[in-house]
Amino acid sequence: MSRAIEVEKITKTYRVKSRRGLFKSSVEFVEAVKGISFTANYGSIVCLLGPNGAGKTTTIKILATLLLPDSGSARVAGYDVVEEASKVRENIGLMLTVEKGFYGKLNGRENLEYFAALYGLPRNIALKRIEHLVKLLELDKLGADRKLYEEFSLGMKARLSLARALLKDAPILLLDEPTLGLDPPSARKIRELVRDMAHRENKSILYTTHNMFEAEIVCDRILLINKGVIVAEGSPEELKDKIPKLKVINLVIKASGDPGKPLERFTFRKEIKQEENSVFNVKMYVPKPEEVLGEIVKALVNSGHEVVNVRVEEPSLEDVFIYYSEGSI
């Protein structure tokens, strides 16, 4: 079987016009995607993981034929996204911003019937498919199949948006931040469904997120993307193994003053966050914590700070992303 998705050196630059004063304006060019390449197989979930503005949504829109790439090529289900756009659209289910495109004066079921008609599904098949999706996504339990869309909660909107993406039962799903802003139960439900669809129904799923935890538990393979460039790829464990063998010293400190001051002489990367009032969380990334931990604690105590808790941990996926996006940790 051919690859579900094949992307080869695609680029996309936006022309952004900004006004300067009453009569003057200037034009800037923003490179959203800078020659990225990757593939995705059927039966797996590939995650584009990166911060806002990294190029995730632009990539999804190119693969969905909503944007043309400036250069490079991409094939979805074996079809070229530029030359065979209609064939691409037949083979994908797309979920973008959860609130886009639905009709407020229709209920959930009526919205799905409307989109099924737009997609050209025969009515008898559409009604059976909608009934299946209403139960699968528990829209009936939430009353979302009967309530007007304008009365939906964000979680109900997300489930309906996913149902719309699944209407055609397409072999390839493009899901752009599907759990963004959702409460934990709704987010968990969507993550479980996504994994089930990939592994039981052999669908290929391209899933974007900026949530490290979500990427680690949902995705089979992760593409770390930053400023339009894929900086690393692999399974969560493979990515962790690629960075230098560092450990994380995690300290909780009750501080009397600036806790960073006594740590200045230690040249390791440090992250200091104030949790509440005088309580700080300090992370230090070191190759051999057993050689420096005593000195670190001593420096803090001698400066009048109370060390409440100390843990030595393996690097997280977040640490991996920091390493690849900033060059080192």
Which residues are covered by each model-predicted region?
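Short, charged/small-residue-rich alpha-helical element at the C-terminal edge
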Residues: 248-320, 324, 329
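An acidic, carboxylate-rich microenvironment
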Residues: 83, 87, 110, 125, ...
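Residue-level marker of the N-terminal boundary of ABC ATPase nucleotide-binding domains
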Residues: 2-4, 30
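ABC transporter nucleotide-binding domains
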Residues: 13-226, 232
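ABC transporter nucleotide-binding domain
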Residues: 193-285
